[in-house]
Amino acid sequence: MNSASIPEVQPAEPQAVLQALPAASVSKTVLSGRSGSKSVGTALWQWPLVFFGWCWRILAGGLLCFTLVGSILVTGWTYRWMQGLVLRGWWKRSRFRQEGSFEDFCASLGHDAPVARPRWLLQERMRTALNRLDAAGRQPSTVRKILRALRLPWHSLWLNFKIGFQGLFCTYLLTGLGCLIMLFSWEFGWLNSFNKGYEQALIGPLTGLLGIFVFIVAMVYVPMAQVHQAVTGDYRAFFDIRFVWRLIRARLSVYVILAALITLISLPLEILKTAPAFFGDWTESWSDAEVLKMLQNYYLICSLVLFVSLLIWRWLAARIYQSAVLKVLGRGWVTRAELHPTLANWLDRLDIFPVPTLESAGLTYLVKSGSRSVYRRTLYVLLFFIWFGFVAKVYVGQFLNYHPFEAFMNHPLVQFPHFNYIPSDLKS
């Protein structure tokens, strides 16, 4: 055979190679290329919108923390934000991260699915909410669309209020008793001291210690329960004690760090609350109207600091919850059937199935189990004293600048995110 008999081989065209690939590979290649270019474009032109969007949300949240009703809206908004954080964290672990954006995945869950940045007023996904099918699977009529359109301007406002009210109600069911006992001990102790009731001198301190203990026991549970209620969107989930307690055990080390963070960032807030007691030296010559105006501006700035502090600890709490759920599933502490339906649905849609792994019994297992038990008990003791410090700063602040009722009945980072301590006589 000579070289003339060998047919000349031409290089394959790129289009021919593409056609030779399986259909699934072609679609995946094209999709990845589009998503890659889309993500680059999003990073280039959308970041100013994201920046200004967050500036608006933080400013609005700070202003709302100045009023009691506004603090309910802030609570609901942060709950919705935590819900989006947790779902986004699981989405990043799934294959859907390579196939589209987080917004696309949430849109596939329905018009009421979580969002990365909740709105304060307008309804999320307006077009989808307006054109969704009715309960019978039929296209909505014109009248129904008009009725739905009436809710668009204020739906998020109502949602924030409803979720916030439910969250605060559940929180006070556990923490309110300790707050009431501490308030009683403080008021009774001072009244008894003024009236020289020496026979009842121990009632105030002893009831105060009881109130502190009851509040601390509640606070060991409350932060994780708040996130669980926020993520599931179900107020009854707050009292899913068995599941929440296993989440705490699964991530106990970082949960202690979370408690320390809450206590740490509450210190500047306590200082800001107490500081006006020392303003008297340079406001003596001011009129009541001038003092009122100054305090309003001061507490507005404090409210902004409170809102940012609230975002910080709830961001960390959402991250802890996100990993804790997967950990309890991976260790077999909770079966998939025991999950809240909302969590189970999300994990199913994301194709996330942690396989339970059990440690083999033996000497190594016994040593590890014993060391973990000692370590866990140490963390519980540390957690107790961290929350004790959280309460102790309130007593110190009360001695320096007395605030009746609200100082003991409301801890802004955990209960009502409200920061307005203007004296009532000055307001009137």
Regions found by a protein language model. Give the residues of each.
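Extracellular/periplasmic helix-loop-helix junctions in multi-pass membrane proteins
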Residues: 273-304, 399-408
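Helix-coil boundary and N-terminal low-complexity module in membrane systems
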Residues: 2-212, 216-224, 228-263, 267-274, ...
